[in-house]
Each structure stands twice: as C-alpha cells, then as structure tokens.
Amino acid sequence: MTEAVERLTKKSEDSSRWYLELVRMAKLADYGPVRGTFAIRPYGFAIWERIQADLDARFKATGHVNAYFPLLIPESYLTKEAEHVEGFAPECAWVTVGGDDELEERLAIRPTSESIICDFYRKWIHSYRDLPVLINQWCNVLRWEMVTRPFLRTAEFLWQEGHTVHATAEEAREEALRMLNVYRDCFYEVLAIPVLTGMKSPSERFAGAVETFTCEGLMGDGRALQAATSHDLGQNFARAFDITFLDENQERVHPYQTSWGFSTRTIGALILVHGDDRGLRLPPKLAPTQAVVVPIWRGKNKGEVRREAEALHRELAEAGLRAEADLDEEHSPGWKFNEHELRGVPVRVELGPKDIEKGQAVLVRRDTGEKEFVGRGAAARRLVELMDEIQQNMLRQAEAFRDENTRRAETYEEFKEIIEEKRGFVVAPWDGTEETEQRIKEETKATIRLLPFEREEGKDLVSGRPGKTAVFARAY
C-alpha cells in the first residue's frame, strides 16, 4: 500500500510558498518551457469551465453573442490609438518571420483585441440601425510579463473580452456599469468572493479608456487583487480607427465603445481567498467534484462496502450532484481524506461496515470540518441541501475577513502602520493628484485600488488638501 504523503506548507506560515505548492500538489497547473507560460491541468481547467459556463450564460442573458477575432495584430493597428500603444507595447510579443521570410510589418500576438476588433467594426457598422453591437470572445492573450506566478500573473492566459459599440455616451457608460455588475454577481454568487466595485484612478485606467471600473478582491494574505475590469472607451478608439455611422438625423458621427474582461487570474483569487492550511476549499458551484464517497473497508467486508459505495455514488449522481467514489485500493482512507481535502472537495462521504450496519453515512464538510451523521436513504437529499449551505457560508466567511481587514486611517502615520503591519484595505481621503498617489506608492507600496461610487469628503492625509474617499492596499 502506497502511503507517501507530501506535506503542504502551511498558509499561515508562508503564504507564497503555500500557494505555489498547492497549485502543483492539487494538479491545477504546471510550468511551461517558456518563461511565464503554464499548462492548466484538467482539474484546474474544470474549474475554469464552470466559471466560463456561468459567465457565458450571463452574457447571453444580457443580449451578447460570441465571436472570434484574429490572434495576430499588425503593428500599425496598435499604434493608431496613442495611449493604447504606449500602455501595451512594452508587453507585446512580436512575430517578425513567417516561414523563412522576414515580414514587412511586425505582428503582435494578441495582448488585448481592441485594435483588431475596431478594424472589423469599421467595416461592419454603417447606420444607427447596426447599433448596439454586443460581442464577446473567449480566447487566450499573451503579455510579456517579467515576474510571473501561476494564474495570478502569467505571460499567456485565458480570458473573455467583451467589445460593444453604442450610439450615445450614456448607453456606453450604462453598458460598462452593467457588465461590472455582471462580474460582481458572478463573484458573489459563484466564486463566493465579496469584491468591492468602483472606479480606477486616472493613472490606473486601461490604456485609451475614458473610465475604468473594477472589481477588487481582498486575498487571504491581506493583499488586493484586481479581479475583473470594465472600460468606458468613449470615442477614443472610434476616432482612431475611423468608425462612423449615420445617425437618425443622417449625420455621420463616431460611436461610443466599451470593453470588459475576466480571466483565469480568478482561479488564483479563488485559491487565495478560500484556501487554508490543508489546501483548497472550493465553493460547491465551482467544484469539479462536489462530494466524494470514501469507502472504509477491511479484509472480508471489502466487497460489501465497495458495492454500497458504488450504489451511493449512483444515487448522488442521480440527484444532480457532481460526485465520485474513491475506490482506489492503493491508499488508506486517511490518505484519501487528506487528498480530497487538498483538492477542496466540499463534502467527503465516509462509508464503513458500521455505517452500513446502522443504515447511515457520515458527511464531513470541507468549509468547517463538521461531521454529520445522516440516514442512508436521506444522504443524497441532505447533500443537495448542504451545497447551498456551504456556498453561503464560504461567502459569509470571506465577507467577515474582508470587513475585519478594512480600516479607516485618520493620519498618514496610521495609514503607513496599517499597510505595513496589518495590510488589508485602507480607506482614506485622496486629493485627486497623481503626485500624492505616487508618493504614497513609493513610500508604502500601496496603490489606489478603487474610488468608491459614493465618496465622502475629507482632508488628504499626505498633502492636507481637500480630498474624497479612496480605497488603498498593497496588491498582486
């Protein structure tokens, strides 16, 4: 019997090492041969598929359709919007040779698709009757990152990017905010991550945007993570790419655009928000396996226990649960318990000879560690109920952590002390100047994560000038 167990570093002792070990040990991802590239393994990809399915349904419910656009973007396209190329050129990977021939123009491997999509929109949009255009694409992108971590910051990653076109500025802003709320709902309802939403400061806006709206999550180590963004692009790209349409007055005008994106970075957020010293803790709505039946057998009762475990597994599947039975004979029940805890399976179902004799099953929750004894015939029904209870409890736990680690600073010294010793979100007035923002970043390594939609007035802690509420944190 194989019993070798690799010990996971405790999150409470070294969260950075814990994270890297967990990604590997839970078989979520593996390193690629090119710096910053990773293979997303089947278990990690199954999580992404569930996120993708949920978001895709939300997009379609709000009138969006899917399409696909080219991976290779001519350099001349990127340079048409000045701020855009300035923001993305340093991160571009370039194709300069095709076969044996040097290309006349460099081709960027898609860092984001505004420029290439705008060229198509220029050809497709002619009249106000063509609007709005509500298109999303699921794809990979490549950004030449220098410092990488699996899921959190990688050179190549998977994402969706929505690109919409509207007749008026009001419609575009409404769309950008609507999609921000779609993201927020997905975080709360599916990932059980209580994100804050608001606006980015001008220096943190997407390159070429009029306004950037953001979902910011607080990770378990007290650092923030930009989890998803939605951009009001105004007419900047429409002007740069000469997208025009005839309005209802038969005047040729530029439309207004939005773009918004959500990536595999959220799997990193899922790990950091919910994971603990024993490994992953997955919300039931995302867990590839919601319940695992672990038979506990010894010698002569092995056949009976195995049959009962298989029967219970079938019942759980028929009840609509994503379930599996761990019938592996190479490892002990204790080893299996640790393995499924590491993988974050929401509920472990233990079934031994005594349980069969008593007509019961033992349910062990991953979120709390609590054990519950239920009648064998009621196990499937109770597990269905537990999925919702666990989902809600994990959100409550994450909300409690976020709230406990959100503090107001009354002086700059207090601000620096919180950032250095406690981390988390710090709420303080900001005078709106890039000078103050940059000084805070240099002295504390904290950045403005967002500007709340409802901002209170106060005195800037650094400059003493009048300011309005901003939320600061150190971030990934």
From Swiss-Prot:
Gene3D superfamilies: Anticodon-binding domain, Bira Bifunctional Protein, Domain 2, C-terminal domain of ProRS. One of its GO terms (biological process) is prolyl-tRNA aminoacylation. Signal peptide: none annotated. Transmembrane segments: none annotated. GO terms for cellular component: aminoacyl-tRNA synthetase multienzyme complex; cytoplasm. It catalyses: tRNA(Pro) + L-proline + ATP = L-prolyl-tRNA(Pro) + AMP + diphosphate. Its main location: cytoplasm. One of its GO terms (molecular function) is proline-tRNA ligase activity. It holds the Pfam family tRNA-synt_2b. Disulfide bonds: none annotated. It is an enzyme of class 6 (ligase). SMART domains: ProRS-C_1. The keyword ATP-binding applies. Catalyzes the attachment of proline to tRNA(Pro) in a two-step reaction: proline is first activated by ATP to form Pro-AMP and then transferred to the acceptor end of tRNA(Pro). This is Proline--tRNA ligase. It comes from Rubrobacter xylanophilus (strain DSM 9941 / JCM 11954 / NBRC 16129 / PRD-1).
